[in-house]
UniProtKB/Swiss-Prot annotation:
Residues reported in the UniProt entry to bind Zn(2+) 2: 811, 885, 892, 895
Family per similarity comment: Belongs to the RNA polymerase beta' chain family.
GO MF, one annotated term: DNA-directed RNA polymerase activity
Residues involved in Zn(2+) 1 binding: 71, 73, 86, 89
Protein purpose: DNA-dependent RNA polymerase catalyzes the transcription of DNA into RNA using the four ribonucleoside triphosphates as substrates.
Protein name: DNA-directed RNA polymerase subunit beta'
Cofactor(s) the protein needs: Mg(2+); Zn(2+)
Cofactor note: Binds 1 Mg(2+) ion per subunit.
């Protein structure tokens, strides 16, 4: 007691510690146990005295006093009466804070159904009763009666009766012989009478006996809910309420406004309606009113309670006085403004301020400039305490006055307080973790925050008016974390790709580029210098310039750490940069002895960081920055209009292209090509033209002009310097300034045929200007959409991956995934080395030539390993991956590999899921929103041939070729690949060559670099004859299956296959046959006839009775009809892949290996089946008629081959080829989108997300576990259930992984808190309550919501220590219990002391 008295002013009772949270349905007794009294009146407060009405919604007797320790009538005041209940007004004398905690209840005169269990789909009550929602609503809203007890009558149990039928039945069978009820009471009776065990047993039998496919699914759903009620201890009748809880009054306050009006929470209105209707109903029942009136009142009560719980879920939305919908209890939780997202996950922070940022070039990397005014305000409490400690002030009031007057001693103290106290700077939008970093404040005059220029790229900040917020970490722990983890000097590398993010940009790059230029014939060329002092002296004397070619001595250190000096051919400018380079054996002068573009500077910083560590790199970066700024200012680079050089050849090129387009027009008029092909070719020609103009311009700008007399090189073009160095501007922008603007897009996304020939220097014509406005406006609209979409993608990614935390060092998994270099059209897009860097080898990596082990199994692959892997010519490496990691909750460090932001193995407790989500989401705003509608030209035309990038010998895989009548080698195989090998047989490149291409090389040829391997027509796809013979037409009849179109303008005829889906006559299957001399169809060597089915739109390129050779085309399919599919690009594509949506024209993939057979057509679909070679069951596909199937009857396909082209659906890849192939597909497809924009993201981030998309397993055979066949269960639950089964020697379940989209996966996490705060709050909570779910609070989000330390980072260590401590406590208690059992209970003095 005595402690309680002392503790009044600081009642810090520790919150009860808990490890998990359970959610269930509240029973009527539970609601009554929470309540402090029943609310009988709808009144709130007395409007004269402002005191709460007794028994009303704010009643002080039920909820507690309004003022601390004072009863309502004022008889008892002050502390000494604590705990007394006043006999006059009935109010307990206690803290007014209890009005935030105490609940009341309303006793309902008639039970009502809880709307969440009724209307939240699937309706829980409906599922349990096996009734439709419509029937349920008819009973609940008093339209139909339901038979509860049929008695001896011929009515059935649970039969619905309308009013008339009910009266008729009463007349027929007598009122007492059966019971029928209406409303929630009826449903409650039925629910109460359910025997769940019997229903569950019956359902299991029914599922086992079901024959159709849909029935067991439906029954399984119902069985699941029955089992949920059995296991959770919820009773079905609790879904019908007899008492409504009333939340504490201070959570739905009534606030007096000036002018005698009140602002009130909507909940009070909703409660008032419930109470009014309930009281009216009670009165009507007492008065024995007619049935119909009571029924109406009950219905109104049901509606009032519905509105209170979830307004608008059923019927009209109930609005307040101002026509605004009232916010019900459900709305309080939902959405961005709901409790979860507004108050629990995102809170406003005190001790923070914001201001505009300006550049602070003289700051060190770890500093920021903080305005004195801001610092004084932010650090006030620290200043007060320091003033007090130093004796400047005796009270806080005095200290406040001193600070307000800004006395000199206050500034001195501010300096002390701020020393070594980091502050955090944040720039919105915070897209990744580098959006908040810690700095040491430096006090400055003025009102703007100064920011170090090198951290701008991390914040994505510029100084055109951006604002930033400052936050002060208060506790020692927070300061420690800010200094150790968040200091800008600790965040040199980008977490997404491990490259430096503290990279000079703009002026600094320009300055360093200018320094590192070397020119011919400058004064003093060829002089030798011993050290920097001599060079500076010569520069000042103007004996040499910064760009002179000189020979200078550079002093470095060798591997033993001894200094050495070496003479390099270099320039004074480069020596200046070299002077700043830290001395290290691995860092030679060659790092700086080159032209310093932005990329080279980045590589240089990377090298310094890798070899010399963090401290050296930070110092180096600061010095490089100073040097860059100084030299950019000294160089005085600017540009005028004459620097934009329009190439002389431009008009020749334009004329040439105009002639080409005229020719295409003519070809179209002659009927040689279709409208679509003409469009493709024209667009293509102009595209090439504008590229060539740009090339010419770049040539002219970059070429070095020399002074004819002295031979000295002239000043390099300034624009070229800016663009080439990477400081500002890109070739694409220069092309628009001085080349030609090129093709523009219509608002619909198609490309306009006539390009913009002018550039900005020449100026646009009116027509051109108008044409270019579409694109400009679309760009602006896109940007706005993009930001929102990108943010939403990031949110979904974070939500799906937030539980992926490093929880153990090594899971010991034997599995892994195979990595190869990614080669696209013969170009190496991502080398093998770059993909395996920083990952763990799953097997020994062996050098093929010598058999030496380069990297032993289980070792992380570092930079020096990568160099050896590159040299050794290894093609494939098996590495550990998070996809195959066997850790239960979270991921293990070995499978994850290197922490990219630190360059070291990843730490325990690192939240890799969130990092992955941020790395993928942050560049989202740079991706386009564009969906390309391309007739194939712009993407295909450049790929009408393939060249070799290497010298070597040609090997051809799957060589199936034929010589056509023109004598060319034509590719007849679908999967032919030309492999180029070295003399020693190492594969250099693999080039896939498409069907119908003409091969320019053959097996065993030697090939030079740049030599063509194959060519093909990019605009059409041929159908080739495989045998020599004579052409015959089948089912090709003029007018129905084929049209002979004569072009009006040219009079040339061509035959096009048309869709013969007419109701009349037999079904036609147009085809071309190849017959022998004997007039019979030739048999193909692989079985089947030489019959070529023709797809719609195919153009026939042969005449009947024409003689063909193998490899000749019988028809061609225009590419536009095969290719005008929208190529979804950019952000929508990434979202589509992560959401695992089926693409519109999904490819059809062979599920088994076997032989193709065509069956009877079905309506407008073609039937195709694959017969397996081993004689198993055939697999059948129905394919829409318009689709081109490039397989003939009798072709042999491998499992996983494409039958119909298109984008494959990820689910199919998973089902047919397995997890590793799926991951490879998703990683490649997503990377492709980012690569186009030049964004680098490490594969492991995408793998982390994919791992979380594969959390569920679908049960194939439940064995002897509790699962149902076809049920989706969590992977961990699946493993645990099988382990349990194995222990009990039962048959385990089998299943296969299921791919879920990120939204779906987030909603199905094991934590209902995390799911509810993401989306569809009502549905998630309803489901969790029915199942009586327990949230173990393992993820990040749940812990933020309940206000605990998150189990990642520092929190992970704390959690680990807590578990160890708990186990120790248990041990001590257990041993003590054991000892006490053997000893008589006599309390000795030692025990008492304890």
């Amino acid at each position: 007691m005595n402690q309680e008295v002392l503790n009044v002013f600081n009642p810090t009772v520790p919150a009860p510690a808990f490890n998990q949270i359970r959610i269930t349905i509240a029973s009527p007794d539970k609601i009554k146990s929470w309540s402090y009294g029943e609310i009988k009146k709808p009144e709130t407060i007395n409007y004269r005295t402002f005191k709460p009405e007794r028994d009303g919604l704010f009643c002080a007797r039920i909820f507690g006093p309004i003022k601390d320790y004072e009863c309502l009538c004022g008889k008892y005041k002050r502390m000494k009466y604590k705990g007394i209940i006043c006999e006059k007004c009935g109010v307990e004398v206690t803290l007014s804070r209890v009005r935030r905690e105490r609940m009341g209840h309303i006793e309902l005169a008639a039970p009502v159904a809880h709307i969440w269990f009724l209307k939240s789909l699937p309706s829980r009550i409906g599922l349990l009763l096996d009734m439709t929602l419509k029937d349920l609503e008819r009973i609940l809203y008093f339209e139909y009666f339901v038979v509860i007890e049929p008695g001896t009558t011929k009515l059935k149990y649970r039969q619905l009766l309308s009013e008339d039928e009910y009266l008729r039945a009463q007349d027929e069978f007598g009122e007492t012989n059966f019971t029928a009820m209406i409303g929630a009471e009826a449903i409650r009776e039925i629910l109460r009478g359910m025997d769940l065990d019997k229903i569950a047993a019956d359902l299991r039998v029914e599922i086992a006996e079901a024959t159709t496919e849909l029935k067991p699914k439906k029954l399984a759903k119902r069985l699941k809910i029955v089992e949920a009620f059995q296991q959770s201890g919820n009773k079905p009748e609790w879904m019908i309420l007899t008492h409504v809880p009333v939340i504490p009054p201070d959570l739905r306050p009534l606030v007096p406004l000036d002018g005698g009006r009140f602002a009130t929470s909507d909940l009070n209105d909703l409660y008032r309606r419930v109470i009014n209707r309930n009281n009216r109903l009670k009165r009507l029942i007492e008065l024995r009113a007619p049935d119909i009136i009571i029924r109406n009142e009950k219905r109104m009560l049901q509606e009032a309670v519905d509105a209170l719980f979830d307004n608008g879920r059923r019927g009209r939305v109930i609005t307040g006085a101002n026509k605004r919908p009232l916010k019900s209890l459900a709305d309080m939780l939902k959405g961005k403004q709901g409790r979860f997202r507004q108050n629990l996950l995102g809170k406003r922070v005190d001790y923070s301020g914001r201001s505009v940022i300006v550049v602070g070039p003289e700051l060190k990397l770890h500093q920021c400039g903080l305005p004195k005014k801001m610092a004084l305000e932010l650090f006030k409490p620290f200043i007060y305490s320091r003033l007090d400690a130093k004796g400047h002030s005796a009270t806080v009031k005095q200290a406040k006055k001193l600070v307000e007057k800004e006395r000199p001693e206050v500034w001195d103290i501010l300096d002390e307080v701020i020393r070594e106290h980091p502050v955090m700077l944040n720039r919105a939008p915070t897209l990744h973790r580098l959006g908040i970093q810690a700095f040491e404040p430096v006090l400055i005059e003025g009102k703007a925050i100064q920011l170090h220029p090198l951290v701008c790229s991390a914040f994505n900040a510029d100084f055109d008016g951006d604002q930033m917020a400052v936050h002060v970490p208060l506790s020692l722990e927070a300061q420690l974390e800010a200094r150790v983890l968040m200091m800008s000097t600790n965040n040199i590398l980008h977490p997404a790709n491990g490259q430096p993010i503290i990279v000079p940009s703009q002026d600094i790059v320009l300055g360093l580029y200018y320094l590192s230029i070397m020119k011919e014939k400058e004064p003093g060329e060829g002089m030798m210098f011993a050290n920097m002092a001599e060079i500076d002296h010569a520069l000042n004397a103007k004996a040499i310039t910064l760009a002179t070619k000189i020979r200078g001595r550079y002093n470095g250190v060798d591997a033993e750490g001894k200094p050495y000096s070496k003479i390099y051919e270099t320039s004074p400018g480069r020596m200046k940069i070299g002077e700043l380079l830290p001395k290290h054996p691995k860092l030679s002068y060659d790092v700086v002895n080159k032209l310093m573009t932005k990329k080279e500077i980045s590589n240089m910083i990377d090298a310094v960081y890798r070899h010399c560590g963090q401290k050296e790199s930070v110092i180096f970066c600061d010095r490089i920055m100073a040097l860059g700024f100084y030299n950019a200012f000294r160089a005085g680079i600017s540009f005028g209009k004459d620097d934009m050089v329009v190439p002389k050849k431009k008009w020749d090129l334009v004329e040439e292209t105009r002639a080409l387009t005229k020719e295409y027009e003519q070809q179209y008029n002659d009927g040689l090509i279709t409208q679509g092909e003409k469009y493709n070719k024209v667009v293509d020609a102009w595209g090439k033209c504008s590229d060539r103009v740009a090339e010419e311009m770049m040539k002219e700008i970059s070429s070095v002009k020399k002074d004819p007399k002295t031979g000295r090189e002239k000043q390099i073009n300034s624009i070229y310097m800016m663009s080439h160095s990477g400081a500002r501007g890109s070739p694409a922008q220069m092309k628009q300034l001085a080349g030609m603007r090129g093709l523009m897009a219509k608002p619909s996304g198609e490309i306009i045929e006539s390009p913009i020939i002018s550039n900005f220097k020449e100026g646009l014509t009116v027509m051109e200007y108008f044409n270019s406005t579409h694109g400009a406006r679309k760009g602006l609209a896109d940007t706005a959409l993009k930001t929102a979409n990108s943010g939403y993608l990031t949110r979904r990614l974070v939500d799906v991956a937030q539980d992926s935390i490093i929880t153990e060092r090594d899971c010991g998994s034997e599995k892994g995934i195979h990595m190869r270099a990614i080669i696209d059209a013969g170009q190496v897009v991502a080398s093998l080395a770059s993909r395996v860097l920083g990952r763990t080898a799953a097997e020994d990596i062996v050098e093929p030539a010598t058999g030496n082990v380069i990297v032993p199994r289980g070792t992380m692959i570092e930079e020096w390993h990568v160099e050896r892997i590159n040299k050794s010519g290894i093609q494939e490496i098996k590495i550990r991956s998070v996809l195959t990691c066997e850790t239960r909750n979270g991921v293990c460090g070995t499978c994850y590999g290197r922490d990219l932001a630190r360059g070291t193995p990843v730490n325990m407790g690192e939240a890799v899921g969130v990092i992955a989500a941020q790395s993928i989401g942050e560049p989202g705003t740079q991706l386009t929103m564009r969906t390309f509608h391309i007739g194939g030209a712009a993407t295909l035309a450049d790929s009408s041939y393939v060249e070799s990038n290497f010298e070597g010998i040609v090997r051809i895989r799957n060589r199936n070729v034929a010589r056509n009548s023109e004598g060319d080698l034509v590719v007849m195989a679908r999967n032919l690949a030309v492999v180029i090998v070295d003399v020693d047989g190492t594969e250099r490149a693999v080039n896939r060559v498409q069907y119908g291409a003409r091969l320019k090389v053959d097996e065993g040829d030697t090939i030079k670099r740049g030599q063509r391997i194959a060519e093909w027509d990019p605009y059409t796809r041929p159908i080739l004859s495989e045998v020599d013979g004579i052409v015959a037409f089948e089912d090709l009849t003029e007018g129905s299956s084929m049209n002979e179109t004569v072009d009006e303008s040219t009079g040339i005829a061509k035959r096009v296959v048309t869709d013969s889906r007419s109701g009349r006559g037999p079904e036609l299957r147009p085809a071309i046959l190849i017959k022998g001399k004997d007039g019979k169809i030739i048999k193909l060597p692989r079985g089947g006839d030489a019959r070529y089915a023709l797809p719609v739109e195919a153009i026939i390129s042969v005449d009947p009775n024409q003689t063909l050779k193998a490899g000749d085309a019988v028809a061609r399919v225009p590419m536009e009809s095969a290719k005008t599919r929208d190529i979804t690009g950019g952000l929508p594509r990434v979202a589509e892949l992560f959401e695992a949506r089926r693409p519109k024209d999904a490819a059809i993939i062979a599920e088994i290996s076997g032989t193709i057979r065509f069956g009877r057509d079905y309506k407008n679909k073609r039937r195709l089946s694959i017969e397996p070679a081993d004689g198993g069951d055939a697999v059948e596909y129905l394919i829409p008629k318009g689709k081109h199937i490039h397989l003939q009857d009798g072709d042999v396909v491998e499992k996983g081959d494409f039958i119909v082209d298109g984008n494959p659906a990820p689910h199919d890849i998973l089902a047919i080829k397995g997890v590793e192939e799926l991951a490879a597909f998703l990683v490649n497809e997503i990377q492709e989108v980012y690569r186009l924009q030049g964004v680098h993201i490490n594969d492991k981030h995408i793998e982390v997300i994919v791992r979380n998309m594969l959390q569920k397993v679908e049960i194939d055979d439940s064995g002897e576990t509790d699962f149902l066949d076809g049920e989706q269960v969590d992977r961990i639950e699946f493993i645990e259930a099988n382990e349990k089964a194995a222990e009990e020697a039962k048959k385990p379940a089998t299943g296969h992984p299921v791919l879920l989209g990120i939204t779906k996966a987030s909603l199905q996490t094991r934590s209902f808190f995390s799911a509810a705060s993401f989306q569809e709050t009502t549905r998630v909570l309803t489901e969790a309550a029915v199942n009586g779910k327990v949230d173990p609070l393992e993820g990040l989000k749940e812990n933020v919501i309940v206000g605990r330390l998150i189990p990642a980072g520092t929190g992970a260590q704390m959690a680990r220590l807590r578990t160890i401590a708990n186990s120790r406590d248990d041990l001590i208690v257990a041993t003590r219990d054991e000892q006490s059992e053997g000893q008589p209970l006599v309390q000795g003095p030692a025990d008492a002391a304890e």
